[in-house]
Amino acid sequence: MKTFVAKPETVKRDWYVVDAEGKTLGRLASEIASRLRGKHKAEYTPHVDTGDYIIVVNAEKVTVTGNKAKNKMYHRHSEFPGGLKSFSFEKLIERKPEMVLELAVKGMLPKGPLGRAMYRKLKVYAGAEHNHAAQQPKVLDI
């Protein structure tokens, strides 16, 4: 008996919509990353992108526990001397609420071309509206 290997052209990808309101950031991000990879499917193959498309709405209402709202820091650097910028979770969720969830999920995906392809299937929106109604996404309870 041979081991089954999924082929990229035969993988069926579904669209799911997730409501992030009141959900904990890390728990939500780990489930989304797992579904983007396709680990919930029987045909999962590590070197093939078998995951589904995930639409996240209400990203501005995601929560963190404890004092992380003030203490959790996000950093970026311009590559120039003295170019380090740091933002707390509170500041970033006010400025760019989608970025918080995107960074959390991106860190949980593989690094390299396959991980970038998986990341492109994630669509995050700050509010309750999204523009993917034509794909008829199913509601996913996490």
From Swiss-Prot:
This is Large ribosomal subunit protein uL13. Keywords: Ribonucleoprotein, Ribosomal protein. The keyword Ribonucleoprotein applies. NCBIfam families: rplM_bact. GO terms for cellular component: cytosolic large ribosomal subunit; ribosome. Gene3D superfamilies: Ribosomal protein L13. GO terms for molecular function: mRNA binding; structural constituent of ribosome. Belongs to the universal ribosomal protein uL13 family. Part of the 50S ribosomal subunit. GO terms for biological process: negative regulation of translation; translation. The gene is rplM. CDD domains: Ribosomal_L13 (cd00392). PROSITE patterns: RIBOSOMAL_L13.
